[in-house]
A protein has these predicted regions:
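N-terminal (or domain-start) structured segment
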Residues: 34-123, 162-164, 186-213, 222, ...
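A ligand-binding cleft/hinge motif common to bilobed small-molecule-binding domains
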Residues: 107-116, 175, 180-184, 211-245, ...
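Sec/Tat signal peptide C-region and signal peptidase I cleavage site
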Residues: 28-34
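An extracytoplasmic/periplasmic, membrane-proximal ligand-sensing/linker region
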Residues: 39-41, 183-187, 250, 272-333
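Bacterial N-terminal signal peptides
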Residues: 12-28
């Protein structure tokens, strides 16, 4: 007879006491681990190549965390397979707070894009905080006779399939932003994938593509230099970085909203005290003038929300995008 069987045979109270003791012991182990954290260097994995918005904000966090927590935080770029390579690496990493994930809206797209995804976006991660949000910008070449969104839609309807939109790759945020725009405006746009957001913007400037739905941090300097013309932004409110540019909703498409964002995650099972420490520091960072100014340079709006709020946002975004992806028929597997 096992110990558990003997306890059970003796009556119900001892087994409840034993289970309670086990739970308390587990909580104690988590608290002890959290008190020692970090006891070595911490890796912030970003599943994209260096230079993009995710990488930029991961490095901002790494520098601040190194100063605050007394250990070296480094950024580890692990691009590939539509961001799933680096994301899966973190999902399979020890849940001790020494491997973190900094990623983007692709995190909420991938459950719909990859039927054979080898991790669960909700079950395998502990959301820490949405760091910033960034709008997408509908962009064209300034020399085109397109002054506003209505002009673009008019041309697209007059020439079905002849308006080419550049994206940063199949299944990317830029791809989905364009696909949703085509649905909402009842137009037929032709998708042209490129290797990254900067390449998509270059395609518009060279005339290879008509339009792009780029994230603002990639193209803000090009807009300011008047090398690209912004027609609209994808969020509900105008962005402070481009206050004179209307939203897509203002142009009459009330259901169009695409929220770009960058956020921090830990593997599921990471001690709550570690998650809370990271989240609290991000919230504090997002209120400092230096960080707010740095975010503004990238066209981003600081968020710094708590884990529970971030999780609610993630669930709502997955619920929104999965049926949209199914409707468009986009597949990347």
């Amino acid at each position: 007879m096992t110990i558990l069987q003997r306890v059970k045979a003796a009556g119900g109270l001892p087994i409840r006491a034993a289970l309670l003791a086990a739970m308390l012991g587990l909580l104690g182990a988590h608290e002890a681990a959290a008190q020692k954290w970090p006891d070595k260097g911490v890796r912030i994995v970003t599943p994209f190549a260096p230079g993009g918005g995710t990488d930029v904000f991961a490095r901002i966090l790494a520098q601040r965390f190194s100063e605050v927590f007394g250990q070296q935080f480094i950024v580890d770029n692990r691009p590939g397979a539509g961001s799933t390579t680096g994301t899966e690496f973190v999902a399979r990493s020890p849940a001790d707070g020494h491997t973190l994930l900094m990623t983007s809206a692709s995190f909420t797209f991938n459950p719909g894009l990859y039927p054979k995804l080898r991790y669960d976006s909700l079950k395998d991660f502990a959301p820490v905080s949405q760091v910033v949000k960034v709008p997408h910008v509908v962009l064209v070449l300034p020399s085109l006779p397109v002054k506003n969104l209505q002009d673009l839609v008019r041309i697209a309807k007059a020439k079905p399939g002849e308006v080419f939109y550049a994206s940063s790759g199949p299944g990317s945020a830029l791809h989905l932003a364009g696909a949703l725009f085509a649905i909402q405006t009842n137009t037929q746009l032709t998708h042209v994938p490129y290797k990254g957001g900067p390449a998509a913007a270059t395609a518009v400037m060279s005339g290879e593509a008509t339009v792009s739905f780029s994230t603002i941090e990639t193209v803000l300097s090009l807009i300011q230099a008047k090398r690209l013309r912004p027609l609209a932004v994808s969020t509900r409110e105008r962005t402070p970085a481009l206050p004179d540019v209307p939203t897509v909703m203002e142009a009459g498409y009330k259901d169009y909203e695409v929220i770009g964002w960058f956020g921090l995650f830990a593997p599921s099972g990471t001690p709550p005290a570690v998650v809370d420490a990271l989240s609290t520091e991000i919230s504090r960072m997002m209120t400092t003038p230096a960080i707010r100014d740095r975010a503004a340079q990238e066209g981003a709006t600081p968020v710094g929300n708590k884990p529970a709020e971030f999780e609610r946002f993630l669930r709502s975004e997955i619920a929104k995008w999965t049926p949209i992806i199914q409707k468009t028929g986009i597949k990347v597997d």
